[in-house]
């Protein structure tokens, strides 16, 4: 099989790299930052942690499929999925909500 370079280590790139590796390719992932995950990051300041990426997993079936097809244990064995309803709430300065 071929040698493949994946540029970036965001969620989509890592999923592609995993699928390519399972298919038998030699995959190297290149990321310019010190961590992987793309927009899924966390930073700490003054003792508080801030998540900078998505807090929701809108299509869990896609991730379940990725775990199955890359030979991992089921997604739910690694991550606790909790139904969120509503997924967002917008409160304005005057107290009204949308």
Label the model's feature ranges.
Residues 2-98:
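N-terminal glycine-rich phosphate/pyrophosphate-binding loop and immediately adjacent elements
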């Amino acid at each position: 099989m071929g040698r493949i370079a994946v540029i970036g280590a965001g969620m989509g790139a890592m999923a592609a790299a995993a699928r390519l590796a399972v298919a038998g390719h030699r995959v190297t992932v290149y990321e310019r930052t010190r961590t992987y995950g793309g927009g899924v990051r966390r930073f700490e300041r003054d003792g508080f942690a801030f998540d900078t990426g998505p807090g929701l997993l809108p299509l869990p079936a896609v991730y379940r499929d990725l775990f199955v097809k890359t030979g991992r244990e089921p997604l739910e064995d690694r991550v606790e999925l909790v139904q969120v309803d509503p997924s967002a709430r917008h409160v304005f300065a005057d107290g009204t909500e949308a």
